[in-house]
């Protein structure tokens, strides 16, 4: 093999990427792949993005590493030649990356799933997706507070906090992370945990994309709840129920039990030309214990309903009567999806009612707009059980995650959607219970800023760790932590 130091002494710039094979090839394993932008179906060979809105460009081509050593070498060579890179795991991020043009590091080959001999620890590759874990976890009698979308990358979700329907009972996914193997900005491969590189481990758990490339992650596995049988309840209401529906959600602010997770979605039924409100409620326990908690939704006199006990591994496909197709539309790649998000400490029913009226008007005025209002209402009891300073994740007290999700094919609608959703987002911020905009960073679109992503109190430490672990800001494409925060200046 050619001496690696020879490559490190060069500084060829982005133009060096015109010949990725000669630049990177000698330092990659046989299983690694190098792709060029002019290759047939170039983008089809990469992990497909969920949305094409403000997507990155890969003018420098792409590399699909197969080993941790491959990742190290790619980072080192890219650094030495001033080639910007963008790392993709599950491909479900929605931030604005349109200003990025460089090299894609596609982690798709890091998809292993391994359980230890004792059966209480799980180690996965950096690109493993949620659907790869649902069946094994059920077979093992274990569970993790995974998200509700099957195609999301597990590690990517974890590094942003890891919310999901189980987190009221189990806490955040990040709280089950015990160790990561990570390639740092210098190209070093290290382990980070509560005992090794503890400061980096703290930062990775909440702002992880800023500090390295996780090649593998190890989680502890709790026993499954109620022998792996959960209650799934679906309800559909007419638009006339919207006021009562939002009042019910508000009443849950201080009464939502940790075993109950509520997801509300309102969309426009173009076939029948009417708005619809749908609710999926999951109760992690037996049916007889669930029914009293579901009574508020029963009292709203749904047009359709289904309440049943089903195995844990079937939960994702059972939700919402499959109104939105397989995986409820969350796994179809390259849709034009434009999302605005807000984290709420409280539900303010009048704000929801006011916005909903405007949303109905927007639907009617824009017949090709298939947007929806998504409300994820989870107890914060599980997240709050872990001290705030234990991880970089900033918003353990959030009770509701709300998205204004714009689904539409014609990008000519972008300006109208952005204007409408920006005003709507600000309306929710004013009654959110927070002093300013707060968001779950994995839902961020990119314009919210560091305080919204990571919280004012976390940023001084995060910035100090950014200077230590990534002073050249190689990992600053996605929701970047600034090198210096204003309280330090």
Curated annotation (Swiss-Prot):
Protein's organism: Aspergillus terreus (strain NIH 2624 / FGSC A1156)
Entry-listed glycosylation sites: 38, 242, 306
Signal peptide feature range: 1-17
Keywords: FAD, Flavoprotein, Glycoprotein, Oxidoreductase, Signal
Designated gene of the protein: tazG
Keyword Lipoprotein: no
Protein name in the entry: FAD-linked oxidoreductase tazG
Record domain FAD-binding PCMH-type: where: 55-224
Pathway, per record: Secondary metabolite biosynthesis
Induction: Expression is positively regulated by the azaterrilone A cluster-specific transcription factor tazR.
């Amino acid at each position: 093999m050619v001496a690696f130091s020879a490559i490190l002494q060069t500084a060829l710039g982005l133009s060096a990427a015109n010949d990725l094979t000669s630049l990177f090839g000698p330092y990659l394993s046989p299983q690694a792949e190098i792709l060029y932008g002019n290759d047939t179906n170039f983008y089809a060979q990469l992990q497909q993005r969920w949305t094409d809105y403000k997507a990155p460009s890969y003018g420098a081509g792409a590399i699909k590493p197969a080993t941790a050593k491959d990742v190290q070498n790619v980072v080192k060579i890219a650094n030495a030649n001033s080639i910007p890179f963008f790392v993709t795991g599950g491909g479900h991020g929605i931030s604005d990356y349109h200003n990025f043009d460089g090299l894609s590091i596609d982690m798709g080959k890091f998809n292993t799933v391994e359980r230890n001999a004792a059966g209480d620890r799980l180690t996965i590759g950096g690109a493993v997706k949620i659907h790869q874990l649902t069946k094994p976890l059920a077979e093992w009698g274990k569970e993790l507070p995974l998200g509700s979308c099957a195609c999301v990358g597990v590690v990517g979700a974890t590094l942003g906090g890891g919310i999901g329907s189980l987190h009221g009972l189990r806490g955040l996914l990040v709280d089950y992370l015990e160790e990561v193997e990570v390639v740092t900005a210098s190209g070093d491969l290290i382990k980070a945990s509560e005992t090794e590189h503890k400061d980096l481990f703290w930062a990775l758990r909440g702002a992880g994309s800023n500090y390295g490339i996780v090649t593998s992650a190890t989680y502890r596995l709790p026993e499954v709840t109620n022998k792996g049988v959960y209650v799934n309840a679906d309800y559909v209401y007419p638009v006339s129920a919207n006021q009562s529906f939002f009042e019910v959600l508000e009443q849950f602010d201080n009464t939502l039990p940790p075993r109950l997770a509520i997801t509300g979605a309102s969309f426009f039924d173009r076939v029948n030309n009417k708005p619809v409100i749908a609710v999926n409620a999951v109760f992690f326990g037996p049916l007889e214990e669930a029914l009293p908690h579901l009574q508020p939704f029963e009292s709203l006199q749904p047009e359709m309903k289904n309440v049943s006990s089903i195995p844990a591994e079937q939960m994702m496909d059972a939700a919402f009567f499959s109104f939105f197709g397989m995986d409820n539309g969350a796994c179809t790649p390259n849709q034009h999806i434009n999302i605005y998000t807000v984290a709420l400490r409280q539900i303010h029913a009048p704000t929801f009612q006011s916005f909903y009226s405007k949303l109905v008007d927007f639907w009617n005025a824009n017949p090709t707009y298939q947007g929806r209002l998504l409300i994820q209402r989870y107890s914060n009891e599980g997240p709050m059980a872990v001290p705030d300073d234990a991880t970089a994740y900033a918003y353990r007290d959030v009770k509701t995650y709300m998205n204004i999700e714009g689904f539409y094919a014609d990008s000519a609608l972008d300006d109208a959607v952005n204007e409408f959703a920006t005003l709507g987002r600000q309306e929710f911020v004013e009654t959110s219970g927070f002093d300013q905009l707060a968001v779950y960073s994995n839902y961020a679109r990119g314009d919210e800023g560091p305080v919204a992503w990571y919280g004012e109190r976390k940023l001084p430490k995060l910035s100090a760790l950014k200077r230590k672990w990534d002073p050249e800001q190689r990992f600053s494409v996605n929701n970047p932590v600034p090198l210096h925060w204003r309280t330090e200046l």
